[in-house]
Amino acid sequence: MILVLDFGSQYTQLIARRLRESGIYAEIVPFFESIENIQKKAPKGLILSGGPASVYAKDAYKPSKKIFDLDLPILGICYGMQYLVDFFGGVVACTNEQEFGKAILEITQDSVIFEGVKIKSLVWMSHMDKVIELPKGFTTLAKSPNSPHCAIENAKIFGLQFHPEVIQSEEGGKILENFALLVCGCEKTWGMQHFAQKEMARLKEKIANAKVLCAVSGGVDSTVVATLLHRAIKDNLIAVFVDHGLLRKNEKEKVQAMFKDLQIPLNTIDAKEIFLSKLKGVSEPELKRKIIGETFIEAFEKEAKKHHLKGKIEFLAQGTLYPDVIESVSVKGPSKVIKTHHNVGGLPEWMDFKLIEPLRELFKDEVRLLGKELGISQDFLMRHPFPGPGLAIRILGEVSESKIRCLQEADFIFIEELKKANLYDKVWQAFCVLLNVNSVGVMGDNRTYENAICLRAVNASDGMTASFSFLEHSFLEKVSNRITNEVSGINRVVYDITSKPPGTIEWE
């Protein structure tokens, strides 16, 4: 196992992800992790991440000096390398020769860390300070146009000024793999088949004959959680699906069919009427979210009580992922609220359940791989993200049954055409928004004054930033023609070309 000490870089999670993609398990801890906890984890090597600070700043982030007493291989990346240089007596300075973006790395000295790596390759830079003078005993391994010491080494200690974890660094994955395998002596033992077997055994032991309640949203995370639990504890799992009437077209039927194929009993609650009645007259986005969250809890509580009367429920399952865990102990300090599944926050006190989070060690891409290992269909696993409040936040203004039907039909057409054109898997997320505005149109010889629909499609890797998708005009024209001809009440279609930032992916 490789342990990554997080100094606040926006790329820290990528380090662990790249290593895991190579079959090497990696964990992330804050830079101030105690030496006792580091020793308990028994890593075979340490990676010091990048960070936004300068090593010579008064409040510069610094780990325990005792990490050097562990006699472990260490790799410093960007700030991590500069910290190593400063700690061992070298010179780091702020110059006018900052580097951001792509640069050419040229290897000047053979090293095990560069085994099988091209002499010249593209790398990703993001630094203002640079190493001016190496500490005694260190050797320069590579350079870039603005960094004479772009990679350094001293026995088992290495430094890289660039970010190997970023996809733009052509040989970055290989370099990280070399450090883990050739320097640290790790083995490729990490994978979803191994994880599934290990986690099911752990769940069986922990839960024994107790009952577990699991809220199913129809999304990937909750479906994978339910499937993993059912494999481990069979009918002691109580899976609950609340249909709030704000789902995509045919969504309920798809979820029910999926769970039937997986042979998992699913308790479906039809709560459409109560949700719509509580949303009547409400236009403000945050109030809509609040009402949906509270109403979900009421519906979930009612169903949970039924099962609780039949036999005490001891556990509640949630789809917490590893990024949520990392954020809760980041270098910014523990979060005030640990992010949880939108459906299960704020449960009443009588639901005094023990928490089970089977996916808390996994990144989103690993959850999909686990789902595949568990036999969940690829089409389902690769579906675009869908918000917890559903179509309520894609209908601007008040929500009504007629608006929901209108949006469902338009959205169905957009997604259907994306799939026909083999574009669905090429965009990160795509959907329609029903705008709270009417416009004048002409249908035949008649004047119309009807709703406008906005098409939204974005490219992203994790949703933190996104750019709008460049869809061909002919494709957009086809979608527009179908929507205006097939969906009653729509006479205008527009395409959103806003990136994030400055906009958000969802409109509300």
Swiss-Prot record:
GO MF: ATP binding; GMP synthase activity
The keyword Translocase is assigned to this record: no
CDD domains: GATase1_GMP_Synthase, GMP_synthase_C
InterPro entries listed in its UniProt record: Class_I_gatase-like, GATASE, GMP_synth_C, GMP_synth_GATase, GMP_synthase, GMPS_ATP_PPase_dom, NAD/GMP_synthase, Rossmann-like_a/b/a_fold
Reactions catalysed according to its record: XMP + L-glutamine + ATP + H2O = GMP + L-glutamate + AMP + diphosphate + 2 H(+)
Glutamine amidotransferase type-1 domain boundaries: 1-189
Residues binding ATP: S217, G218, G219, V220, D221, S222, T223
Pathway recorded for this protein: Purine metabolism; GMP biosynthesis; GMP from XMP (L-Gln route): step 1/1
PROSITE patterns tied to this protein: GATASE_TYPE_1, GMPS_ATP_PPASE
Source superkingdom: Bacteria
Enzyme class: ligase
Residues of the GMPS ATP-PPase domain: 190-383
Entry EC number(s): 6.3.5.2
Assembly mode: Homodimer.
Protein name as catalogued: GMP synthase [glutamine-hydrolyzing]
Source organism of this protein record: Helicobacter pylori (strain Shi470)
